[in-house]
C-alpha cells in the first residue's frame, strides 16, 4: 500500500503525499480537489469542535478520513480515485457524526472506524449500480451507513446515544423584529459550518476561505445557498 501511495502522490512520495491525499479527501466533501482547501476545512473542524466543547469531533474526522482512505488502497480500488481524495470524503463525515451523536466509548471509536471503512466499499457498490445512468453516489454512503449505525446504537449499551435528540416537531422561529443583522450573519456562517456538523461561525469562515482558495464560484454559491436557506426559514 505504501508503494501505491508513493506512486500516486507524486515525486516526493512518503507520508507527506499521504497527508495531501487525506486533505484532498476532506476538501472533496464540497467537491474541491485541493489539499489546501482540505487543510482549511480541517482547521475549521478542529476550531469549531473545541470551541463547542466537543474536541473529539475533530479527532473523529481525522480518524474517519484516514481509515476510509486506507481502505480504498487495501481493497485495490483505482489509485487515481485515492489520489483525488475520493475515498476520504465520506469517512471524514462519519468521523464528525459519531462523536457528535454518541458518547465517548471504545465501542464508539471502533464503530466509527468500521463505518468509515464501510463507506469506501459502499461507495464503489453504489457507483457501479448507478453507472448506467451516469449518477454518482456522492455522500450517500455516509448518510446510509451512518443512519444504520445510529439506528442500531439505540439498542446497544456500548454505543450510548448521549447527544442524539428525540424526534420533535420544529419550533417557530423568532419574530423578525427580534432578529438583528449580526445574528443573521452568524446563522448564515454556521449554516456553512454545519456541512460537517460543526456549529461555529468561525468554522463557516474557514470553509468559505477554503472554497475561495480553490474556486471563487464555489465559495460564492456556497454563500448564496446558505443565505437562501436562512432567508427561507425566516420567511416561513
Feature locations, PLM:
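A residue-identity detector for tryptophan
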Residues: 36, 47, 59, 87, ...
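Short, non-helical or kinked segments that cap or interrupt transmembrane helices
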Residues: 58, 78-93, 134-136, 218-228, ...
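Hydrophobic core segments of alpha-helical transmembrane domains in multi-pass membrane transport
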Residues: 40-48, 65-71, 113-121, 142-152, ...
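Helix-loop-helix junctions within the multi-pass membrane cores of secondary transporters/permeases
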Residues: 176-180, 194-209, 225-234
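Membrane-interface helix-loop-helix junctions at boundaries between adjacent transmembrane segments
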Residues: 86, 91-168
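Early transmembrane hairpin of solute transport permeases
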Residues: 42-46, 50-119
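N-terminal signal-anchor module of multipass membrane proteins
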Residues: 1-77, 187-198, 203-214
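Long hydrophobic alpha-helical segments that form multi-pass transmembrane helix bundles
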Residues: 3-8, 137-197
Amino acid at each position: 500500500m505504501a508503494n501505491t501511495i508513493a506512486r500516486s502522490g507524486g515525486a516526493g512520495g512518503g507520508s507527506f503525499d499521504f497527508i495531501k491525499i487525506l486533505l484532498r479527501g476532506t476538501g472533496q466533501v464540497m467537491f474541491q480537489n485541493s489539499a489546501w482547501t482540505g487543510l482549511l476545512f480541517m482547521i475549521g473542524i478542529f476550531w469549531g469542535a473545541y470551541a463547542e466543547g466537543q474536541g473529539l469531533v475533530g479527532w473523529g474526522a481525522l480518524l474517519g478520513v484516514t481509515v476510509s482512505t486506507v481502505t480504498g488502497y487495501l481493497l485495490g480500488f483505482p489509485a487515481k480515485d485515492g489520489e483525488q481524495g475520493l475515498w476520504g470524503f465520506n469517512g471524514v463525515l462519519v468521523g464528525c457524526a459519531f462523536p457528535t451523536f454518541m458518547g465517548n466509548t471504545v465501542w464508539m471509536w471502533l464503530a466509527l472506524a468500521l463505518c468509515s471503512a464501510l463507506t469506501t466499499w459502499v461507495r464503489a457498490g453504489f457507483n457501479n449500480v448507478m453507472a448506467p445512468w451516469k449518477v454518482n453516489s456522492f455522500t450517500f454512503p455516509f448518510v446510509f451507513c451512518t443512519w444504520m449505525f445510529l439506528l442500531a446504537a439505540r439498542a446497544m449499551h456500548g454505543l450510548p446515544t448521549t447527544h442524539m435528540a428525540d424526534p420533535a416537531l420544529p419550533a417557530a422561529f423568532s419574530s423578525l423584529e427580534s432578529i438583528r443583522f449580526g445574528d443573521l450573519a452568524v446563522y448564515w456562517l454556521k449554516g456553512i459550518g454545519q456541512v460537517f456538523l460543526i456549529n461555529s461561525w468561525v468554522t463557516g469562515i474557514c470553509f468559505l476561505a477554503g472554497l475561495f482558495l480553490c474556486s471563487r464560484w464555489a465559495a460564492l454559491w456556497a454563500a448564496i445557498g446558505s443565505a437562501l436557506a436562512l432567508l427561507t426559514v425566516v420567511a416561513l
